[in-house]
Amino acid sequence: MTDSSNAHEAENPTVPTPDNEIQDLQQEIATLKAELKEKNDKYLMVLAESENARKRMQKERQEMMQYAVENALIDFLVPIESMEKALGFASQMSDEVKNWALGFNMILQQFKQVFEEKGIVEYSSVGQKFNPFLHEAVETEETTKVPEGTIVEEFSKGYKIGDRPIRVAKVKVSKAPAPQGTEAEIENNNE
């Protein structure tokens, strides 16, 4: 029987030995560790993507709220400017009108305070170099008193939040005077 069992073992070499079992188990452990690492990496990637999406959505929501507030406040700019102009004339009126103007001026200051709290500030343009990002030129004026492209008059104020204008200022811009000479000389030069 020993001869036959030896012959049987020789025919069937897949009988596990303790060393083979250990090797197989170590291989299986290594494979499982690699799979676990891969799944953990995928989990961390999905978690990071989810966190980024959450932050992006939160930022978009905040921007939408900010734009909604801006748009609502922008609608008040024209009436506020009208009130400022009217209050400018109050100093020429009777004492009773001046007293009323003081009250309206307080209300105007409250509006301006709300604007500042929301980050909306007006900017002055007179004396500044024309910037198409901040200004809309509605008129030009020939002059040698200031360099060409300088704003000489402001028709309506500009407003911005941070560096972003929400309403550009409407201005008059200086330009260099036309060359001196008679019309006939200018026409002859053009021909």
Curated annotation (Swiss-Prot):
CC per GO annotation: cytoplasm
Region feature Disordered, mapped onto this chain: 1-22, 172-191
Single GO molecular function: protein-folding chaperone binding
Domain of life: Bacteria
Broad class of where this protein is predominantly found: cytoplasm
GO biological process assignments: protein folding
Subcellular location: Cytoplasm
PROSITE patterns for the chain: GRPE
Keywords: Chaperone, Cytoplasm, Stress response
InterPro entries: GrpE (IPR000740), GrpE_coiled_coil (IPR013805), GrpE_head (IPR009012)
Biased composition (Basic and acidic residues): 1-11
Gene3D superfamilies, sorted: 3.90.20.20, Head domain of nucleotide exchange factor GrpE
Family under the similarity heading: Belongs to the GrpE family.
Function recorded in the entry: Participates actively in the response to hyperosmotic and heat shock by preventing the aggregation of stress-denatured proteins, in association with DnaK and GrpE. It is the nucleotide exchange factor for DnaK and may function as a thermosensor. Unfolded proteins bind initially to DnaJ; upon interaction with the DnaJ-bound protein, DnaK hydrolyzes its bound ATP, resulting in the formation of a stable complex. GrpE releases ADP from DnaK; ATP binding to DnaK triggers the release of the substrate protein, thus completing the reaction cycle.
Subunit structure of this chain's protein: Homodimer.
Protein name in UniProt: Protein GrpE
